[in-house]
Design a protein with these regions (language model features):
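Short, contiguous, well-structured surface segments enriched in hydrophobic/aromatic residues
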Residues: 1-72, 94-95, 141-151
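Polyanionic, low-complexity intrinsically disordered segments
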Residues: 45, 55-82, 89-196
Length: 196
């Protein structure tokens, strides 16, 4: 923490202090942060910080280690964070399904998407829509980062249920853009998570 810029250090201290009364991590704060003489283990630190602070810490580690794989994962996680924030604030992800972005698309993600979006122009179009890009990036990041078979199995079950819900309301079949997006997401789930 001592290597942070003053503004980032103050923000981190504030975020940690906010958790001092938390039912879930207040005891960690009392044990490791209140007592200035103790060192806080990384696992406890990660339990107490926000997702944004976690990514800042992850970036620090990537720069310190000069590791390209960690850096690539970091940029995937920035996109995951955007989708997570939208979901946390109960935003309707498909409200404006045609909204585009100008972000550089991860080359590995493009290659993986080529397995189920054969046409290069169709792939560019789908990955160019921000909501589709964020959802596909989140699924791809899970594939690359999650090593727990139990968590992966649970996610497979959740995604199988999601596939069933996509066209539960027939209104979605009438909108070509939503139908095309859902079809791509179903193919991504089937390809990456082996759900049939």
């Amino acid at each position: 923490m001592n290597q942070l810029e003053k503004s980032n250090f103050e923000q981190l201290q504030h975020d940690l202090w906010k958790n001092s009364g938390s039912l879930y991590c207040g005891n960690l704060y009392a044990k490791y942060i209140d007592d200035q003489n103790k060192r806080c283990p990384v696992w406890a630190f990660l339990e107490m910080i926000s997702f944004g602070q976690y990514l800042y810490f992850y970036k620090y580690c990537a720069e310190l280690l000069q590791n390209t794989e960690i850096t690539e994962r970091l940029y995937l996680m920035y996109t995951v964070k955007s989708l997570r924030n939208a979901c946390a604030h109960n935003n309707c992800i498909i409200n404006d399904i045609n909204s585009t972005h100008n972000k550089r698309i991860n080359a590995d993600l493009q290659r993986e998407c080529a397995k189920f979006i054969k046409s290069p122009s169709s792939r560019r179009r789908h990955l160019g829509h921000i909501s589709t890009y964020q959802i596909l990036t989140t699924m791809y990041a899970h594939q690359r980062i999650c090593i727990s078979t139990g968590v992966h199995k649970h996610i497979c079950g959740e995604l199988d249920e999601l596939k069933k819900r996509f066209f539960r309301d027939n209104d979605y079949r009438l909108n070509d853009n939503i139908k095309a997006t859902f079809d791509v997401l179903i193919r991504a789930i089937d390809t990456w998570f082996h759900i049939r």
